[in-house]
Amino acid sequence: MTDLSHIRNFSIIAHIDHGKSTIADRFIQICGGLSDREMEAQVLDSMDLERERGITIKAHSVTLNYKARDGKTYQLNFIDTPGHVDFTYEVSRSLAACEGALLVVDAAQGVEAQSVANCYTAIEQGLEVIPVLNKMDLPQAEPDRVAQEIEDIIGLDATEAVRCSAKSGLGMEDVLEELVRLVPPPTGDVGAPLQALIIDSWFDNYLGVVSLVRVVQGTLRLKDKIIAKTIGKSQLVDGLGVFTPKPLQLKELKAGEVGFVVAGIKDIHGAPVGDTITHAQTPDVEALAGFQKIKPQVYAGMFPVSSDDFESFREALAKLTLNDASLFYEPESSDALGFGFRCGFLGMLHMEIIQERLEREYDLDLITTAPTVVYEIETAKGETIFVDNPSKLPDPGSINEMREPIVEANILVPQEHLGNVITLCVEKRGVQKDLQFTGSQVAVRYELPMNEVVTDFFDRLKSVSRGFASLDYNFLRFQPAKLVRLDVLINGDKVDALALIVHRDKSQHMGRQLVEKMKDLIPRQMFDVAIQAAIGGQVVARSTVKALRKDVLAKCYGGDATRKKKLLEKQKAGKKRMKQVGNVEIPQAAFFAVLKIDS
């Protein structure tokens, strides 16, 4: 095995679409990790969803052997990281296992807010950051301008930055040479008691829990007895190895290496991410500093369409939580939708991804309510409570003060789109804190209510800036605000799953818009359906879905039986997506109407 001075652990920091996964592909090709026949684009993005959306969601790892120009062979452990703002937690975990990071910037587009945020995380964790200018093959590449931008915005000297094109393969070996030269080797003692950090875990139906670990001290061998510090239950190591990117079984993993461990753990919570693994005979080894547990920012109710799926839904969530430590869930029941779970997510993209993974990987049919953020409420008795579900909001009389979460949003935008972005932030009740011109870009800092950010802010920001603005935000504080609960009544019955918490100044406008939207989405019945929006006891908007006249002539006379069967099946599939609320069927689209309101 390689000695410590020849190991390099690194990850790549890049904004979405700046070519991170393609660089990974080139590294694998240069180092011969896969034969040309097995090579495919974005080989590390193994989830179908990742390929379809063209984003990296999960962190992946690869171990490659690179023969450098100095004639020595180096073991490169590369941990791939996602670039989207919702997955920053995955990034901080990957960085915790590295000594260096490549900051990849698109030579045509320049620096984006997300790379700035992740780059600061890397610098705070003491990593060596190496700037790389990618996409040099593009005619619109401006390396000198972008190098200056990296220096202005992040403060890294990028005059010597490697210039490469992952697509054409130009300059990729120079990137590897820089990596070997600049990233420090890991420190650690192979003979010390074992300490290994769990970077990621996932559930395999045959092997049980598989964990990706970075060995910090000591050596991990096959048939060793190991324990996870927080659980303390001893397990036998059945298999360990590295991904090249195919799994390669090894006899041992030494200090400084990154690889996977299988220890026959069948319990989903048997290997929590961020925990320390050590030998059963040295249980009092110091735990490694993991990463802070992240708090969900957005909550939504998820309910199985058929109540028979409740147990399989619970299992699916448990397996997903193992793989995605930032997902939170607790049981919840709704008068309208029955039993389900209240789930917490890092942002809207995270929520969509989780919903799609549940529906695809676990074959569940789900109804999701509109997402809300967490509010802090001081009751008349002086107690402080947190509410993440509008239907759990106490009676207005017993509330002393309501506070909403405020986020600090850092936006990078080209100068010509600055006006539109400022207009959007003001419309979303934002307060400008800072504005700096750096080259052709402007860095704006705003304080915005999180409630406004999580719904459609990201999409609107992209559309007003023609896709050029980038956003990074983090929670700042709770701030008092005039908030009210907007209830939706259908035929006089409150539908708890449709309630919203909104700002008082916007409540009437929101009520009217919501009612109009619902009117278009609720199918016509055999009777008039009244849709009302109310605040407390006061109705602020009303609309009526007119009754339908039954068409008695549209019956099939005789004809082919399979034709009738087809029509019945089609109707059955449509009914499945609906839920009976009192006596009106509400389609899934109506639950999401809330998101489409122009506040």
From Swiss-Prot:
Keywords noted in UniProt: Cell inner membrane, Cell membrane, GTP-binding, Hydrolase, Membrane, Nucleotide-binding, Protein biosynthesis
Matches recorded under CDD domains: EF4_II, EF4_III, LepA, lepA_C
Any single GO BP term: positive regulation of translation
Catalytic activity: GTP + H2O = GDP + phosphate + H(+)
GTP-binding listed as a keyword: yes
InterPro entries in the cross-refs: EF-4, EFG_III/V, EFG_V-like, LepA_C_sf, LepA_CTD, LepA_IV, P-loop_NTPase, Small_GTP-bd
Any single Gene Ontology cellular-component annotation: plasma membrane
SUPFAM superfamilies in alphabetical order: EF-G C-terminal domain-like, P-loop containing nucleoside triphosphate hydrolases
Subcellular location(s) per record: Cell inner membrane
PROSITE patterns attached to this UniProt entry: G_TR_2 (PS51722)
Residues that hold GTP according to the record: D17, H18, G19, K20, S21, T22, N134, K135, M136, D137
Covalent S-S links between cysteines: none
E.C. number: 3.6.5.n1
Top-level EC class as recorded in UniProt: hydrolase
Membrane topology, from the record: Peripheral membrane protein
Keyword Nucleotide-binding: yes
The organism's place on the tree of life at top rank: Bacteria
TM annotation in the entry: none
Ranges where the tr-type G domain occurs: 5-187
Family classification: Belongs to the TRAFAC class translation factor GTPase superfamily. Classic translation factor GTPase family. LepA subfamily.
Cited function: Required for accurate and efficient protein synthesis under certain stress conditions. May act as a fidelity factor of the translation reaction, by catalyzing a one-codon backward translocation of tRNAs on improperly translocated ribosomes. Back-translocation proceeds from a post-translocation (POST) complex to a pre-translocation (PRE) complex, thus giving elongation factor G a second chance to translocate the tRNAs correctly. Binds to ribosomes in a GTP-dependent manner.
Record protein name field: Elongation factor 4
Species this protein is from: Cellvibrio japonicus (strain Ueda107) (Pseudomonas fluorescens subsp. cellulosa)
Taxonomic classification: Bacteria, Pseudomonadati, Pseudomonadota, Gammaproteobacteria, Cellvibrionales
